[in-house]
């Protein structure tokens, strides 16, 4: 039996119908679904958007969308979409609605998100997805899969054009993880956000493996794999991190990031002078590279990106004289700063993202080289180190390198060497630049002795190490040969970075050869 819509004659009746429909669209899943959500302590899809964007700035699009010809269709079709402002700049936002078909992807869901992505490309603004979805809508069969593919195609079109960000606030399974993994930043809430292609039950049935939900797709585990870039403790912290991240970025690849408080502290400060004593006298003693970073950039402001993956390298954003720079720094607190597979991938990805949005790069170097080991070789250190190298050369933004202490072997090359197109290279007097460290060179020497542990051999070893550190692993040879532009007092670093970025602000590369694209090692 078909229900006939009442014929409305007056404007007042039409306005009343509009209000009734909009009220129904606020909670399309009904009171029961809303109560179930509230009992779990989960905010509504709209409440999440309101907390992310600037107050009063959200304009919803498609609230009255629903699948045509479906008697069970609900308004919104499982997703809230619209436009708002973050830090006063436009963004596109969508948020999955768990009360409508579990936030799964259906026909109008796909159309709404696809249109939002096209709008972001058209106006040149970031897109942020708040993800809490059950994946594909089974009852929609191939239609749901088709829309996943359609959205995937649009992610590729937006890639490198505008920033794409995903916030994971629930159990995102199957198709629901393919969109987030294509975005530039993935933020998840600990013990709330999960990502996996197939759940524990399916894995048990297919392979016989027993695995818990947390082990399989928990935020911390996925962060260690490099799939999630920031794990936070609450939804509020996730929204704040996204706001902070976007504050360092341009709205699109043709724009420039906001300039924040330029001209601060134009003279050397007490914090600058602390750099003169920050590097330990012993080469084998660790220190936290963050202590250096907080002193060489504006306001001690540094935003870590992907802190839980590849911890031998720190990546993140800071400002030099109010302007954004991307930072790639070794972390002596983790494996002495030796670069492993995960750190290589992390650095390569960060460099390519920064280059896509024309963000200058600063390399801060203290590494004994690439991490040796059978597992590293099995897992592709050659190829993955090659990606790192490729990304550094490919990036044509301004690049400045500060060598603080160790810079050995192949790691010397990838950490912003002049030979890989760095524009300006500086070193502290504490820098040790060589093919290999003194201890490694001594190990090679000891192979000549029948008994390396003999007192005579050990005395020769000690003398060799001292001589190597005094005459080989020093910054002066690199400076003499033009590989280092200047050896500087550590306390000069912050202001020297400022001068360098001013000089390089209008950097142009006229010698680039026209081609479709190079082939990164994959």
UniProtKB/Swiss-Prot annotation:
Residue span, CoA carboxyltransferase C-terminal domain: 270-503
Induction: Expressed at higher levels during the exponential growth phase.
Keywords, sorted A to Z: Transferase
GO molecular function: acetyl-CoA carboxylase activity; propionyl-CoA carboxylase activity; transferase activity
EC number(s) reported in the record: 2.1.3.-
GO cellular component, one term: acetyl-CoA carboxylase complex
Keyword Phosphoprotein applies: no
UniProt record, GO biological process: carbon fixation; mycolate cell wall layer assembly
Keyword Membrane: no
Pfam assignment, any one: Carboxyl_trans
Residue ranges occupied by any CoA carboxyltransferase N-terminal domain in the UniProt entry: 11-261
Quaternary context: The biotin-dependent long-chain acyl-CoA carboxylase (LCC) complex is composed of AccA3, which contains the biotin carboxylase (BC) and biotin carboxyl carrier protein (BCCP) domains, and AccD4, which contains the carboxyl transferase (CT) domain. The complex also contains the beta5 subunit AccD5 and the epsilon subunit AccE5. The four subunits are essential for activity, but AccD5, together with AccE5, probably plays a structural role rather than a catalytic one.
Record's function text: Component of a biotin-dependent acyl-CoA carboxylase complex. This subunit transfers the CO2 from carboxybiotin to the CoA ester substrate. When associated with the alpha3 subunit AccA3, the beta5 subunit AccD5 and the epsilon subunit AccE5, forms the LCC complex, which is involved in the carboxylation of long chain acyl-CoA. The LCC complex can use C16-C24 substrates, the highest specific activity is obtained with carboxy-C20-CoA. Has low activity with acetyl-CoA and propionyl-CoA.
Identification of the protein by name: Biotin-dependent long chain acyl-coenzyme A carboxylase beta4 subunit
The organism of origin for this protein: Mycobacterium tuberculosis (strain ATCC 25618 / H37Rv)
The encoding gene: accD4
């Amino acid at each position: 039996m078909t229900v006939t819509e009442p014929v409305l004659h007056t404007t007042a009746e039409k306005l009343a119908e509009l209000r009734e429909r909009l009220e129904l669209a606020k909670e399309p899943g009904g009171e029961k679904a809303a109560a179930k959500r509230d009992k779990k302590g989960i905010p509504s899809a709209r409440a999440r958007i309101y907390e992310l964007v600037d107050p009063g700035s959200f304009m919803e699009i498609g609230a009255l969308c629903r699948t045509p010809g479906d008697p069970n269709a609900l308004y919104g079709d499982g997703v809230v979409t619209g436009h708002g402002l973050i830090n006063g700049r436009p963004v596109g936002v969508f948020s999955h609605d768990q009360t409508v078909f579990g936030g799964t992807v259906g026909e109008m869901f796909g159309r709404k998100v696809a249109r939002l992505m096209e709008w972001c490309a058209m106006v040149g603004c970031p897109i942020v997805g708040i993800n809490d979805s059950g994946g594909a809508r089974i009852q929609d069969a191939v239609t749901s899969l088709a829309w996943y593919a359609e959205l995937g195609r649009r992610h590729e079109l937006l890639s490198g054009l505008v920033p794409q960000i995903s916030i994971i606030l629930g159990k995102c399974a199957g198709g629901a993880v393919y969109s987030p993994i294509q975005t530039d930043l993935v933020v998840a809430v600990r013990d709330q956000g999960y990502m996996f292609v197939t759940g524990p039950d399916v894995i048990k049935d297919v392979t016989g493996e027993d695995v818990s939900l947390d082990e399989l797709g928990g935020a911390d585990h996925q962060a260690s794999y490099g799939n999630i870039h920031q794990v936070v403790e609450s939804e509020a912290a996730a929204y704040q991190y996204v706001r902070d991240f976007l504050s360092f970025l341009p709205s699109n690849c043709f724009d420039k990031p906001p300039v924040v408080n330029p001209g601060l502290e134009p003279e050397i400060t007490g914090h600058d002078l602390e750099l003169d004593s920050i590097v330990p006298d012993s080469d084998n003693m660790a220190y936290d590279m963050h202590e250096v970073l907080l002193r060489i950039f504006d306001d001690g402001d540094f935003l870590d990106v992907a802190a839980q993956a590849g911890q031998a390298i720190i990546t993140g954003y800071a400002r030099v004289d109010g302007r954004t720079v991307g930072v790639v720094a070794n972390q002596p607190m983790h494996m002495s700063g030796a670069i492993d597979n995960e750190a290589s991938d992390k650095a390569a990805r960060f460099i390519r993202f920064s280059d896509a949005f024309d963000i200058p790069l600063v390399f801060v170097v203290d590494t004994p080289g690439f991490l040796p080991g059978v597992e590293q070789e099995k897992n592709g250190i050659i190829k993955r180190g090659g990606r790192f190298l490729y990304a550094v050369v490919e990036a044509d933004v301004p690049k400045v390198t500060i060598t603080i202490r160790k810079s050995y072997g192949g790691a010397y090359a990838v950490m912003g060497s002049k030979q890989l197109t760095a524009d300006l290279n500086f070193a502290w007097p504490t820098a040790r630049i060589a093919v290999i460290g003194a201890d490694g060179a001594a190990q090679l020497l000891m192979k000549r002795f029948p008994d390396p542990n003999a007192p005579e051999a050990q005395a020769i070893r000690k003398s060799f190490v001292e001589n190597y550190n005094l005459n080989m692993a020093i910054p002066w040879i690199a400076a003499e040969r033009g590989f280092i532009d200047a050896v500087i007092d550590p306390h000069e670093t912050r202001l020297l970075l400022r001068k360098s970025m001013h000089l390089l602000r209008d950097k142009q590369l006229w010698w680039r050869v026209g081609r479709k694209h190079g082939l990164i090692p994959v």
